Amino acid sequence: MLTFIGLGLYDERSITVEGREALRSADRVFAEFYTSRLVGADVDDLEAYHDTEIEVRAREGVEQDPEAILAAAEDGHTAFLTAGDTMISTTHTDLRLRAEERGIDTRVIHGVTAQSAASSLTGLQNYRFGKATTLPFPYAHGGDDVPGSVIDTIEANRERGLHTVVYLDIKVGTGPTGPDPDHEEYMTADVAAGLLADGWEDALAVVVARAGSPDAVVAADRLSALADREFGDPLHLLVIPGDLHHVEADALVGLAGAPAELVEE
């Protein structure tokens, strides 16, 4: 049996009760934290809180050599953990398909995701979001600007009146000069806003910082203004709103501090 368990957004307590029970009853527990991280807890915190040993795998190991996970699932109850929800990444869908092909029963226990939290915290309606995109560090894509794919996604959504979630790059184990096991870097919202402001400086944007934590921050303003502010510890993301329903506009003013004249434009 292979159970995929989403850990939620922030720390060892963000998991659902159902997920916690499945985790504690597993014979072996694997985890992958490349796709996203729990910035409020490390592996030691998770192991202590859930009274279990966790075997962390690199993303490449999950994608290219998942045999240890699959073999464990054939022999007993195995749990596979990620931050957020495990099925957001195609890497984990592939692992589930491999398990099913080998006759291994699978189960998914969902966790809260950054996208659902972004909608909840900002007051932007869930069904008015379009395709999401990820903004990489400039060195990660070999340029010094915003990739065309990111611009195309935002513009396509805006043309349809839809909001865009912009996930911000995470680099763990790889830095500007190549592989580095000690490298851990998170793009912050001010850096992202600065990159996107080159061409959209007056565009409305919303920062969501540390969703799921006790000190989550939501702030809305022009991209150029957000680029000059600091939002504290990661994880951060940006939302580029499309057309606003009047309730959404009120929410951005009341919950995120957006200038009233900006949401009326």
UniProtKB/Swiss-Prot annotation:
Single GO MF annotation: diphthine synthase activity
Catalytic activity from the UniProt record: 2-[(3S)-amino-3-carboxypropyl]-L-histidyl-[translation elongation factor 2] + 3 S-adenosyl-L-methionine = diphthine-[translation elongation factor 2] + 3 S-adenosyl-L-homocysteine + 3 H(+)
Record-listed S-adenosyl-L-methionine binding positions: L9, D85, I88, T113, A114, L168, A211, H236
The keyword Methyltransferase appears for this protein: yes
SUPFAM superfamilies with a match to the protein in the record: Tetrapyrrole methylase (SSF53790)
Known partners and oligomeric status: Homodimer.
UniProt-listed HAMAP family: Diphthine_synth
Protein family membership: Belongs to the diphthine synthase family.
Name by which UniProt lists this protein: Diphthine synthase
Provenance organism: Halorubrum lacusprofundi (strain ATCC 49239 / DSM 5036 / JCM 8891 / ACAM 34)
Lineage: Archaea, Methanobacteriati, Methanobacteriota, Stenosarchaea group, Halobacteria
